[in-house]
Amino acid sequence: MDKIERIKELVEKLNRYSYEYYSLDSPSVSDKDYDEKYYELQELERETEYVLPYSPTLRVGDVVLEGFRKYTHKARLWSLDKAQSLQEIIDWHNRNVKFVEEARGRGENLPDLKYVVTKKFDGLTINLTYNTEGILEIAATRGTGSIGEEVTAQVKTIKSIPLKINSNDILEVHGEAIMTQEAFNKYNETSDTPLKNLRNGAAGALRNLNVKETARRNLSAFFYDVGYKEGTPFKTYMEMMEFIKQQGLPVDDYIRVCTSIEEIEKEIDYVRDIRFDLNYDIDGLVIAIDDIRTRELIGYTVKFPKWAIAFKFEAQEATTKLLDVEWNVGRSGRVGPTAILEPVELAGVTVKRATLNNMDDIARKGVRIGAEVFVRRSNDVIPEIMGIVPESLEGSEEISVPEVCPACGSHLVLNGAHYFCENTLSCKPQLVKTIVHYASREAMNIAGFSERTAEQLFEKLNIKSISDLYKLKEEDLIGLEKFAAKKAQNLLEAIEKSKDCELYAFIYALGIPNVGVKTAKDLVSRFESIEGLKNATFEELVGVQDVGDIVAQGVLAFFKEEKVLQTIEELLSLGVSPKYEEKEVIASAFEGKTVVATGSLKNYSRTEIKDKLESLGAKVAGSVSKKTDYVIAGEAAGSKLTKAEELGIKILSEDEFEEMLRR
């Protein structure tokens, strides 16, 4: 094979591999195989000076452009009318019903109304133009809707966008360039000027003349409309979406067909529920009539198509005033800042507090007391301050670190980016949180133990170590608030019962940094005893599934602490007896599979179904993804079941699950 033919073969293979990896999430080759072919292609292109216009090597952002050229779209990119209440959707639907009835009265043969519901992505709209050879010729921003700015070099850095498609028609496809949360976090870890939000990250990347900077932001995209196409027109929107998908353009998994307001309302509730679990931002839903002929007849206003509407969710980002900063002590002794905010409505809740990670983060973002700040809420966690409104800095105050621990007055020590209180003997928040963690359900499971109990043990009984729990007597507890003889006896019995525990629960209870329940189980499966784990080397630790360098270093440092070793020795001498029994994996259809259980099951609690699946060799996951093999759905299964249906994952009822066990 000559070099030109080899170049063509490599380009075809590499583009197919990219489609499998980025669009199907199902790679057929390893990264190593891909890289070898990519480097071979680079070398051949250098030797021959022959580069196909859709070669993957053209994605590399290594140019700085002089400016943006204007581009006139072949078909207008319309804005959408917006609704913020269900009543507005109902009014819009009623207008559509009336129009269809009147059109039928004039002799038009229109089908019953059917709506297609999709997510409204919060990024930057882009328009791709492919020529008659299927090659990506122009990429442009929406601009005015009629005229945009050419951003072809920038868009080519988005690896999920095919540089060549199968269509031979001149084609314009509309989509949204987005930045995922994962890409956003990774970029901000190393950026001197952190991005404030995902939308600005995407928009700023495409409007950057330095294409290398665009590539650094690792954008993604979803496509949802063919604005212009020569040849046979589409009959329905669903047919159009199928065409887009067949061209290898990335299409979101979520797309719903609804025939009633009740169905639309259900989809609004569902997407609102999963919104913060997504890896990217959406700000609502788009509801559009499916039938293209009906669309043509309904037409447009001056600004909007009448056949579609956007339902907008509550904002997940807002600006408000930073009133103060409060410093709190965690279980590890880390003293961290929390922002006290002027209350603001954000994604349906009133926000008064937000995360400020550390002083380095505060300095990078330029956050000051009294300034207006951008606050963002995602994934149902405490909101985070993303940056400041520059115009509000006048009269603001610098945030300063307390000189001593706010809880115990001890000297603070800077370790990396964080400040720590090293008073592990009498700093109340550290000790209380350590004891509460030790007693928690997934750890030693001491029933009836609360944070208030831990505070009283510290304040009135001078309990300063988890081992002190096993020295408590009934007369000690009766003197505490709300502790009568019965409650005291129950707590002592629960403490005694905790001595007989599983090894993974004991390891988790010790509070090793970055070791959760799953990691504790993985460590136990490898080392089988507390002694085995104490004596593990770094190489042995990183050899455990899902254990990386940070966790391994944390485990090694933990077991070097003399106080830790003394506490473990004392716990064992007081009768705590962690046990490890290697669970026999029962051969089954679930061995090696990823399974999610959702809803209420008749014969299993959450813990029981998890234990059962693990005994069958399954990996039990908490959320549904493309990597999920089975979803076991009980009564009142919610969004996880819906997502499984979207992704085409095998769904089992409880009866079907048990039938598979009997085979």
Curated annotation (Swiss-Prot):
Domain BRCT: 585-663
Binding site for NAD(+): 31-35, 79-80, 142, 176, 312
Reaction catalysed by this enzyme: NAD(+) + (deoxyribonucleotide)n-3'-hydroxyl + 5'-phospho-(deoxyribonucleotide)m = (deoxyribonucleotide)n+m + AMP + beta-nicotinamide D-nucleotide
This protein's UniProt keywords: DNA damage, DNA repair, DNA replication, Ligase, Magnesium, Manganese, Metal-binding, NAD, Zinc
SMART domains: BRCT, HhH1, LIGANc
GO MF term set: DNA binding; DNA ligase (NAD+) activity; metal ion binding
GO biological process: DNA repair; DNA replication
GO CC terms: cytosol
Cofactor list: Mg(2+); Mn(2+)
Pfam annotation, one family: HHH_2
Transmembrane annotation, as ranges: none
Enzyme Commission designation: 6.5.1.2
Catalytic residues of the enzyme: 120 (n6-amp-lysine intermediate)
Top-rank taxon: Bacteria
Binding site for Zn(2+): 405, 408, 421, 427
Family per record: Belongs to the NAD-dependent DNA ligase family. LigA subfamily.
Function: DNA ligase that catalyzes the formation of phosphodiester linkages between 5'-phosphoryl and 3'-hydroxyl groups in double-stranded DNA using NAD as a coenzyme and as the energy source for the reaction. It is essential for DNA replication and repair of damaged DNA.
Protein name: DNA ligase
Organism of provenance: Clostridium beijerinckii (strain ATCC 51743 / NCIMB 8052) (Clostridium acetobutylicum)
